[in-house]
Regions:
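Ligand-binding pocket segment of bilobal, Venus flytrap-like solute-binding proteins
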Residues: 138-203, 210
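Short helix-loop capping/hinge motifs at secondary-structure junctions, enriched
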Residues: 96-102, 121, 134-142, 216-221
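Short secondary-structure boundary segments
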Residues: 58, 118, 183-184, 240
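Alpha-helix capping/helix-boundary segments
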Residues: 9, 60-61, 167, 184-186, ...
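Extracellular/periplasmic juxtamembrane helices and adjacent flexible linkers that interface
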Residues: 218-305
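Periplasmic-binding protein-like
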Residues: 83-88, 150-154, 161-162, 191-222, ...
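Bilobed "Venus flytrap"/periplasmic-binding protein-like clamshell domains
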Residues: 8-14, 119-144
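N-terminal segment of the mature folded domain
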Residues: 1-121, 255
Length: 305
């Protein structure tokens, strides 16, 4: 079975795959795994890369597979809306938080150097951009002012890698003062021994991570997705830094520490009126010809593809 995923969840997916092989539905099933920037992965599948299950970082990337006739149009009608796990947009700062970064406006302070991926290749980066804009709007800025503040934020960006994982590698190699990333990416880095401090800004954005089977995938693909939503596997997500979509698993005593970590207050969503869903948000912000990020990137000399 061919599993194509964005770069960040490789450790948790390998745990799920290992356990799946011990179940009746997984016996005799071997996996070919591919990891990379979410947008690049989606484009590769459209271009013919073999895929049975995709786990990508935005619904927008799944919709591109729908447009190519590879995924059912009603994929969001699946249990949990087709989402396998959640996260939120968060910051990682240096140990001790020497720049005193606690919220979005702190990223705009003189001398603060920010690391975030390139939104024209990385789904993580798209979440980061929309989270920054949404936070400014939620804090009282009108649309024009919020766009100005996002532009100012990108004047502080010192590195735009192609994916969330490579951006994290850049930060942990010593570049920048703050990394904008998935909360789950931060926990994965800490588990691997990287040094830093997690800051979940208020407000922030809920990241919804879709996992779907392609139209012509074998039955084992749907079985794997069902398995990924079962409580035991959702506990694996929860204990690996992802917010489970099966919320009841957080009631378990062994996950009490994670439950406390995930209790960071409400988060706004891509479906909110402020964004109007992925299709509208992508058109407004990331269209390669007219999107707001094209102008912002050009103004700071950043990449636009």
């Amino acid at each position: 079975m061919n599993l194509v995923a964005y770069s960040t969840p490789k450790p948790v997916l390998q745990k799920l795959i290992s356990r799946f092989g011990h179940l009746p539905a997984g016996q005799g099933v071997s996996f070919s795994q591919s990891y990379g920037p979410s947008g690049s992965q989606a484009r590769a599948v459209v271009a013919g890369q073999p895929a049975d299950v995709v786990f990508l970082s935005t619904g927008l990337d799944i919709d591109s597979l729908v447009d190519a006739g590879l995924v059912p149009k009603r994929w969001t009608k699946a249990p949990y809306g087709g989402i396998a796990a959640d996260s939120v947009v968060a910051f990682v700062v240096r140990p001790g938080n020497p720049k005193h970064i606690h919220g979005w406006k702190d990223l705009l302070k003189p001398g603060v150097k920010v690391v975030t991926p390139n939104p024209f290749s990385s789904g993580s980066a798209k979440w980061n951009v929309l989270a920054a804009y949404g936070a400014m709007r939620k804090s009282g800025a009108n649309d024009h002012k919020a766009v100005q503040l996002v532009t100012k934020l990108f004047q502080h960006v010192v590195s735009q890698d192609p994916s969330g994982s490579t951006a994290a590698n850049t930060f942990f190699s010593g570049q920048g003062d703050v990394l904008i990333t998935y909360e789950s990416e931060a926990y994965a880095a800490f588990a691997a021994g990287k040094q830093g401090k997690l800051v979940v800004p208020k407000p922030t954005m809920l990241i919804q991570l879709p996992m779907v089977a392609l139209k012509n995938a074998p039955g084992a693909a749907k079985a794997f997705i069902k398995y990924a939503h079962a409580p035991k596997q959702q506990r694996i997500f929860a204990a690996t830094g992802y917010r489970p979509v099966v919320k009841s698993v957080l009631k378990r005593p062994d996950l009490a520490g994670w439950r406390k970590k995930y209790d960071t207050g409400p988060a706004f969503k891509i479906q909110d009126r402020l964004f109007g869903g992925w299709l509208k948000a992508n058109r407004v912000w990331f269209d390669p010809n007219e999107g707001r990020m094209v102008g912002i990137e050009r103004s700071v000399g950043g990449p636009t593809h």
